[in-house]
Amino acid sequence: MIMLNRILGLFLACLVSGMLSARNAKELYIYHTNDMHSRVEPFPAYFPDSVLADKAGMVRRAAFIRGERERHKNLLLFDSGDFSQGSPYYNLFKGEVEIKLMNEMGYDAGTIGNHEFDFGLDNMARLFRMAEFPIVCANYAVEGTALEGLVKEYTVIERDGIRIGVFGLGAPLEGLVSRANCEGVKFEDPVAEAQRIADLLRNRERCDLVVCLSHLGWDGTPYSDVKLIECTRNIDLVLGGHSHSYFEKPKRYKNLDGMEVPVQQMGKHAAFVGKIIVTMDK
């Protein structure tokens, strides 16, 4: 059962929350980011957008995650895409800085955002080879391209006897990515692919928890997190991106079985890190 969520602003202050749980329950601490857009340095304190002022920065985030790992052994860290594009670091080094810093933070998995294509497939392949965490995306068929063998449909992680299945979904490429930068990559129906993978994770892989890293966007498009939840089953949690939506707490929508599934998204620039505590009876 997903019990609690808190938003953690990266300005060296955070909410500290207590939680009561059953004596034999196990807890997973899931932290997540989306749409970092190469925000390597923090925003200055005088930045005109007060929501972002004196927040973000990858060194801050790394220090925060390091501290959380010391407190919580069952910690997972995910990214929902678009770590690329938005600063001179990306323009000069084409994603190498961001990937290396994500490696240092110990990300457990990430999915593909549309801006990962900005310097083409060969550059994506170079970055994905550098990544020390799996890149998951179930609805981009990459066979015959530079990405073949570098993108997985899903990954399974074990923490304290709990099996967590994680898969990713990417946004439609047409209109977002130039054809030259994604030639040979085929976009497939994310709802159909999500159902296929969720069933596989639940049944064949015997996962206790199924998590979707989505770069579809929250709502209002033909493919969205809302539609994804409402048209599928066997997905327990959606960690979103792409629409730069900021939720102070998860939104919940009913799936095909009438079960409420939470979706969370943390705005942009990784100014905030999402935290969700999952309590398992296992």
Where are each of the predicted segments found?
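Sec-dependent signal peptide recognition
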Residues: 2-13
